[in-house]
Structures are given as C-alpha cells and as structure tokens.
A protein has these predicted regions:
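A preference for well-ordered globular domain cores
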Residues: 1-102
Length: 102
C-alpha cells in the first residue's frame, strides 16, 4: 500500500469511530423522558430499580435531578421499557447502516 492509500484508510477508520461516538451520544440523549413530573433515563438501571419495587404500586424515587417524585411503578416501568426498546431498535438500525458503509 502506498502512503495515500494508508492515509485514506486511516481517515475512513477515524470517520467510522467518530460516527459511532456521535451515534451513541445521540441515542443516549434520546433515552431521557418525562413522567409524573420527573425526568428519567430509560435503561437497565431504572428498570431494575422498578422491578425491585414491583410489590408496591406507588413509590417515591429520585429522578435525574435528585428530585423526589411519587410514581406509579407499573406505569413508569411500562413507559421506561417501551422507550428503551424503541430507542435501542432505532440505534441498532442506524448502527447497521453505518457498518455497511464501512
């Protein structure tokens, strides 16, 4: 390989890594949602917390801003799980498209 080909390969690799990082940041920001007057981040941590509280219908949890919020556990779990799945599926579709361009 000549130097021009090596430089082109390095730039393409850098662009791919940067695009993946931007994609991750984009979907991490989309994981945020509002519910019951609080801001929440959909993800395994929230879902595990809600599963631990499953025996109670209403609990008080701290949202992203450390504000105590009374929530209905089944409602918040359903919303968090649905939001998580929607965003992860969309992220996977975009990730697969980017991987094909490489």
């Amino acid at each position: 390989m000549n130097t021009d080909a090596l430089i082109a390969h390095a730039r393409a690799r850098f662009d791919h890594v940067a695009a993946r990082r931007v994609l991750k940041e984009k979907y991490e920001a989309r994981m945020l949602f509002a519910h019951a007057g609080g801001m929440w981040r959909a993800g395994p941590e929230l879902q595990c917390t809600l599963l631990a509280c499953a025996q109670d219908k209403d609990v008080v949890l701290l949202d992203l801003y450390e504000t105590p919020v009374r929530v209905n556990v089944p409602e918040l779990f359903a919303k968090a799980h649905s939001h998580w799945q929607e965003q992860m599926n969309a992220w996977l579709v975009e990730y697969d498209e980017q991987s094909k361009k490489r």
